[in-house]
């Protein structure tokens, strides 16, 4: 399992939100490229970038920062989400050196777009499912749909989606532990690998995910915990690697 540091971009700065609320943002750095360097030095093997402005505006807003990080670390897999609603945007990011694009809102509203994107950019597409009480939320979490996360995940199995980033909105940014039960249920219900997100507070939360012995969970995204120092990236990755060795 990979420990994946999150860099959330708002107005060019690295921030964290609580429960996806744009007016409840903590600025952690005015230099996201330097922040990426910090996590690379800590030994991360993948980065999770989110264009928060883009998620709300429906098109990339912090694209220059994303490109700068991708250029600085050409060998580091980077996944980007937020405002990805067209094939042109995906092409722009892929050309910039980004490894994966995360389709969120558009995946819920127009599932056929995921099929198109997977066909045009095989192996590059991740679907972001943000859920509240099992139902998928869209538009920067402003709207909760009537679509069940598990049903939508199954819908994408035939498309060749690389992974699903599953975020429990109620947990995100609150550091109260990840929704292990819902994450495991999704991983077991679908053949698509799952990346857990939202609520990870400390090494104990990583251990809980590992203890489920769910092969379908391939990573855990962490944000506020690594910025506030309750989780150490290197230590958490070492724990995951140890589990893999034991198997």
UniProtKB/Swiss-Prot annotation:
The keyword DNA-binding does not apply. GO terms for biological process: L-histidine biosynthetic process; L-tryptophan biosynthetic process. Its EC number is 5.3.1.16. The keyword DNA damage does not apply. Keywords: Amino-acid biosynthesis, Cytoplasm, Histidine biosynthesis, Isomerase. It is found in: Cytoplasm. It comes from the Bacteria. One of its GO terms (molecular function) is 1-(5-phosphoribosyl)-5-[(5-phosphoribosylamino)methylideneamino]imidazole-4-carboxamide isomerase activity. It is an enzyme of class 5 (isomerase). This is 1-(5-phosphoribosyl)-5-[(5-phosphoribosylamino)methylideneamino] imidazole-4-carboxamide isomerase. Its main location: cytoplasm. Pfam families: His_biosynth.
């Amino acid at each position: 399992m990979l420990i994946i540091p999150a860099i959330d971009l708002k107005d060019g700065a690295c921030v964290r939100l609580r429960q996806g609320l744009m007016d409840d943002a903590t600025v952690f750095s005015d230099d996201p490229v330097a922040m990426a360097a910090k996590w690379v030095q800590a030994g991360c093997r993948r980065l999770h970038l989110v264009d928060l402005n883009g998620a709300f505006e429906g098109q990339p807003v912090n694209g220059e920062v994303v490109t700068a990080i991708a250029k600085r670390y050409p060998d580091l897999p980077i996944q980007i989400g937020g405002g990805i609603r067209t094939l042109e945007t995906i092409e722009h990011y892929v050309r910039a050196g980004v490894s994966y694009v995360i389709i969120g809102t558009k995946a819920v509203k127009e599932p056929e777009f995921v099929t198109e994107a997977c066909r045009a950019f095989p192996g590059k597409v991740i679907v972001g499912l943000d859920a509240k009480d099992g139902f998928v939320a869209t538009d920067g979490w402003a709207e909760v749909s009537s679509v069940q996360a598990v049903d939508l995940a199954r819908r994408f199995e035939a498309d060749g989606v690389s992974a699903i980033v599953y975020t429990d909105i109620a947990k995100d940014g609150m550091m109260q532990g990840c929704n292990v039960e819902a994450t495991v249920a999704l991983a077991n219900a679908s053949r698509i690998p799952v990346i857990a997100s939202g609520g990870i507070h400390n090494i104990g939360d990583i251990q809980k995910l590992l203890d489920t012995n769910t092969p379908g969970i391939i990573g855990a995204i962490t944000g506020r915990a690594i910025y506030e120092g309750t989780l150490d990236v290197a230590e958490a990755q070492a724990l995951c690697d140890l589990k893999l060795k034991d198997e």
